[in-house]
């Protein structure tokens, strides 16, 4: 068990790193919020079979109030770290080892009943479930757990960014509010259920009915345009709104759609209701680096 701290862009985020018991989604303990595809899971399952090691933590969010976990994280982080390093993106990481059995017992008891939201790693989580069923073993076998990075939903350093869409299919968007620039368009999305659009060198803001802009954009606009066609064949994704504009200007796509960052409380609410969002609904930044911590899926496995 570890505490991880990352410093980036003037922010600090602290996480707990631990083994989390794998549970089917039907148990309503681990909550997904995005749909997955078969291809990526097949690749990840092959990697697990070959290595029998979790090489990077999956990222989960939890509501820390009244759990005591954020307080444990803060106490541990008050001392000198065991490891400090700079990641490839210039982010600064620090890692503390939690070796106190009393803390282990307290945190394990809390995690046993804690509902968590998958932030990043839907494909890997479902792969880990498949691997656990494949290898079998007793209920407490290492393969029945996954390496988890757990972040309090209220952590001030938690950053989620929107992913913008560029549609390659022909499209006509009407009923929008004209805007003079990309910056003005993005500013107009804050606090609204709306999407920005760019087509034929013109920006618009498209008001949408509903609670979550991304869901309504797909339900009311993109799905109507594509019909029964696979959206993954006609959509491009980028976190850079300027890139989306360039793709349209260069003829790579016919229209760009811009979104504001999602409200994580709304995402959690939908996940608790059993509803999933379209692909690439969220982008959490920065992600935990691969290889920071390993977790053996066999007790006698040597690294």
Model-predicted regions and their roles:
Residues 1-303:
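Surface-exposed, charge/polar-rich loops and edge strands
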């Amino acid at each position: 068990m570890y505490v991880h701290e990352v410093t980036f862009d003037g922010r600090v985020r602290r996480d707990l790193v631990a083994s989390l018991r794998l549970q089917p989604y039907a148990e309503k303990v681990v909550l997904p919020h995005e749909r997955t595809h078969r291809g990526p899971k097949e690749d990840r399952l092959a990697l697990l079979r070959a290595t029998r090691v979790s090489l990077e933590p999956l990222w989960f969010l939890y509501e820390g109030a009244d759990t005591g976990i954020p307080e444990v994280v803060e106490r541990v982080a008050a001392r000198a770290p065991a490891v400090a390093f700079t990641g490839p993106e210039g982010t600064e990481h620090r890692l503390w080892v939690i070796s106190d059995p009393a803390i282990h017992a307290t945190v394990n008891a809390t995690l046993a009943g804690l509902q968590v939201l998958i932030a990043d790693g839907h494909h890997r989580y479902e792969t880990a479930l498949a691997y656990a069923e494949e290898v079998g073993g007793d209920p407490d076998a290492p393969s029945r757990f996954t390496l988890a990075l757990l972040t309090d939903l209220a952590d001030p350093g938690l950053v989620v960014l929107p992913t913008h869409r560029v549609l390659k299919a022909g499209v006509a968007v009407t009923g929008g509010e004209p805007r003079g620039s990309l910056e003005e368009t993005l500013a107009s999305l804050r606090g609204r259920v709306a999407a920005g659009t760019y087509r034929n060198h013109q920006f618009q803001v498209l008001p949408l009915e509903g609670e979550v802009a991304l869901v309504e954009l797909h339900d009311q606009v993109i799905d109507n345009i594509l019909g029964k066609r696979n959206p993954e064949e006609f959509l491009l994704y980028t976190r850079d709104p300027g890139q989306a504009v360039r793709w349209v200007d260069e003829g790579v796509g016919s229209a760009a759609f811009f979104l504001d960052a999602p409200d994580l409380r709304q995402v959690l609410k939908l996940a608790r209701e059993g509803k999933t969002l379209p692909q690439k609904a969220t982008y959490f930044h920065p992600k935990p680096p691969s290889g920071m911590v390993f977790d053996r899926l066999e007790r006698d496995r040597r690294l």
